[in-house]
Amino acid sequence: MCGIVGYVGTQQAAPLLLEGLRRLEYRGYDSAGMAVCGPDGLRVQKAKGRLQALADLTDEGKAMPGVIGIGHTRWATHGEPNDTNAHPQVSESGRFAVVHNGIIENYAELKKKLLEKGYTFRSETDTEVVAQLLDWYYRDSRDVFEAVTSMLSAVEGTYALGILCADTPDRLIAARKDAPLLLGYGEGENFIASDVTALLRHTRNVVYMDDGELAVVSAVGIRIYDERRRPVEKERHYIDWDVDAAEKGGYAHFMLKEIFEQPTAISKAITGRIQEGRVVLSDLTMTDREIRDIGRICIVACGSSYHVGMVGKYNLERMLRRSVEVCLASEFRYSDPIIGPGDLVIVISQSGETLDSMAALREAKKRGARILSIVNVVGSSIARESDDVLYTWAGPEIAVATTKAYSTQMVVLNLLGLYFGDIMGTIDLETYTAMVQGIQALPHQMEEILSDTGYIQAAARELAGHDQVFFIGRNLDYALSLEGSLKLKEISYIHSEAYASGELKHGTISLIEEGTPVIAAATYMPLFDKAMSNVVEVQARGANVLALTTAAGTERMHSRVKNVLTVPETEAMLLPQLGVVPLQLLAYYIALERGCDIDKPRNLAKSVTVE
């Protein structure tokens, strides 16, 4: 959601803050601002809309001299998007500037008390309460650290905070609770940020803050304190990401670039994990006995990661002969789940910071379940709190609509199923071998799909003018349809829903009329005849069908459907890995035809870190 960047060192802060904020644009925002301490004291500039408005207002930061500052891109939660509600929020005295990601749940109560003490408020935000509260405590103590500590004791809710005080222009203070925040270590300069991509051009050495921690950041060092305000030493993580991976590299959009990066991303995800035809997951600490003794398996995730989990349910049940449940993290945490010792909860998250997934993890852990996470960001909160973690190694994913993270999550989940199935003795050698060989072939097969996109672009032009598109599919094709539908609505703003084909007669078919676009996923050949029957069924009501199938089904599908998207043959459980690529491209080209902001679709954020 909101993006935070802070800098203290010897360089001019504002241009660096703008650069960092640009690298956080993908998180979603509606306004931006910066605060810098310089020769003229504490200066703040804010602007509604795109970050370029702030850059123009400050002459790319040159109009705000100073070597220490904080910046923020805001996603409105309290108060409408405007200059006044943008961050940084400043205390009435002008002494404190605060940037904040999260929600202060008791802000109304605190605001009432501050009003009674004579404070006035300019904004509608909960964050202004933090700034005013700091000022109140500072009046008594004249000690910034003590004021921050008192403020943190008073507020309830979630927060990642960057704090700048005009009286101490050589240091920043950072604090975290249930919202991501990290510290970057440089040479004669140090940083704070909500996401490592903001810092990659300046440092690869970072420390991820844990809940309840507070950090004092100066040019000469960083001091970290735990919840009881005792100094702590923390392990630094080296982020081995290619800086250029966070650039477009000649592509029109990050999303298109990341679609085309999927073959390489899959290759990285499986490197070292398949050896001499066997799956080897040396990352795991689970013993063979612990694996054999697994009871229930529950996959917990949000958004596209949830769709990965749906594919995982089908595949893990086939490979492990265990019941697998897949739950939305936002529902799991409130559902009083039947989970406990001996059960395995698999948490899937690209960022490793998704708030609902984090809360679900903690709920499952509290009940005694073992936690295994599949995440992309090394050292992220979910990774740190899991018993085991499998990294996807997808590298930075900038577009809001996920592509390569989805694909790498799925391949890692399939590897996990093979690894467990081998140890449990629940998967036959023929299936195991076919799956391993199929996974190794995925990068080449994806490249084959990506080598010819002209017919997908043509199909996109036919669909771009419609206001709604339906997806249908059975079994794995239903899970695939859900992801295809989500991609389309995310970036093209076309109303789209995915339905299990067998449910058409239970109400959905009433929505089909003359010319209604229906995308029929029919890659799973054991159910191909049923898929064809559903195609005929919707065509009889006037639907204009676009089909997705394998090379084996193309000729038969063409007998009924003009436009057919084709993927290569592979093991049945791997078909969603290939089928998603043409659906990603279709969504991209439709959004392009409609002139949409593909990388930063309206009202969406890359990482959802508030409820």
What are the residue ranges of the model-derived segments?
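Glycine-rich phosphate-binding loops that contact phosphosugars or nucleotide phosphates
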Residues: 292-441, 521-526, 530-565, 586
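Acidic/histidine-rich
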Residues: 155-189, 464-490, 525, 532
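Active-site phosphate/pyrophosphate-binding segments
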Residues: 153, 262-266, 270-298, 388-517, ...
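Glycine-rich oxoanion-binding loops at beta->alpha junctions
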Residues: 67, 71-84, 275-289, 312-348, ...
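Conserved short alpha-helical segments that host acidic/polar catalytic motifs at enzyme active sites
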Residues: 1-248, 252-253, 264-298, 334, ...
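Glycine-rich, anion-gripping cofactor-binding loops and their flanking helix/strand elements
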Residues: 182-208, 330-365, 505-537, 571-584, ...
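Generic C-terminus detector
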Residues: 229, 544, 570-611
